[in-house]
């Protein structure tokens, strides 16, 4: 039996800790909601996967691969975590991947693949929405709703600063220097910075007062990589809304197109709003 492929133990950084009161990354806010401290964001953890995925799929992963994760347990600043992937079987283009804390606690579980994205961990989920009348925080968010169209330019400054400061977990030199495709490649956190960050312009005004966190994230490439210092057009939309006993959640998706109109990258994400943090649930 082939051995599981492992990445190094890495002290993941909560680089959003300074967002202040009302953020799940703030120690006081997170502790009040039952966490051990300000949580490390999911995109920080996603940065740790590409070196392992290069060993599984080669550089083709940045061209037409995906990474699809459900987050299971939150970590706090500088807790050590490690990435694992099953070896790729002959004739198969998808593998199971996961992340564990140093003590073995599962942080995230999902899939990675090249080629067909339709059978990923997150795209196999049931996206039938709940009755919107049951929602109190996300009651203005509707399936199919546009979250906007945006023309963007991928600036290098934030990614380079994070790279130089040692904040990107297990970083690839391609994030700062040249790559097989010429310029610098976007790290997963930078894909999120644009494809999630711009969609929040459309979503945030519709969300009631609450503390949010990521429940699941998938990034995928179709005609990648997603490069720095390039122009892209983004289209974002709501997939569905629903709830669990502790949260209300929204699934939404953003596509990035190049100047030829080809889809370069995709983001599918679940954002959760904690009921315990919302005045709408204070009865």
Regions found by a protein language model. Name each.
Residues 1-14, 76-142, 223-283:
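HotDog/MaoC-like acyl-thioester-processing domains
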């Amino acid at each position: 039996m082939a051995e599981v492929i492992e990445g190094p133990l890495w002290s993941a950084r909560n680089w959003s800790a300074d967002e202040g009161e009302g953020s799940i990354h703030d120690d006081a806010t997170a502790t009040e909601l039952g966490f051990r401290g300000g949580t490390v964001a999911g995109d920080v953890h996603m940065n740790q996967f590409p070196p392992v995925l290069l060993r599984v799929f080669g550089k083709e992963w940045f061209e037409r691969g995906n990474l699809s994760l459900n987050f299971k347990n939150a970590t706090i600043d500088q807790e050590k975590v490690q990435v694992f992937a099953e070896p790729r079987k002959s004739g198969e283009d998808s593998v199971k991947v996961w992340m564990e804390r140093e003590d073995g606690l599962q942080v995230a579980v999902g899939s990675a693949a090249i080629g067909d994205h339709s059978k990923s961990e997150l795209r196999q989920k049931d996206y039938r929405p709940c009755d919107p009348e049951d929602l109190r925080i996300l009651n203005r968010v509707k399936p199919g709703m546009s979250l906007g169209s945006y023309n963007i330019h991928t600036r290098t400054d934030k990614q380079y600063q994070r790279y130089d400061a040692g904040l990107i977990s297990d970083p690839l030199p391609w994030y700062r220097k040249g790559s097989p495709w010429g310029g610098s490649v976007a790290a997963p956190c930078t894909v999120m910075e644009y494809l999630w960050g711009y969609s929040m312009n459309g979503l945030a005004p519709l969300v009631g007062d609450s503390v949010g966190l990521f429940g699941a994230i998938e990034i995928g490439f179709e005609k990648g990589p997603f490069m720095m210092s390039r122009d892209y057009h983004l289209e974002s939309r709501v997939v569905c809304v629903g709830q669990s006993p502790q949260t209300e959640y929204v699934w939404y998706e953003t596509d990035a197109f190049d100047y030829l109109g080809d889809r370069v990258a995709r983001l599918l994400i679940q954002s959760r709003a904690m009921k315990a943090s919302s005045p709408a649930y204070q009865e």
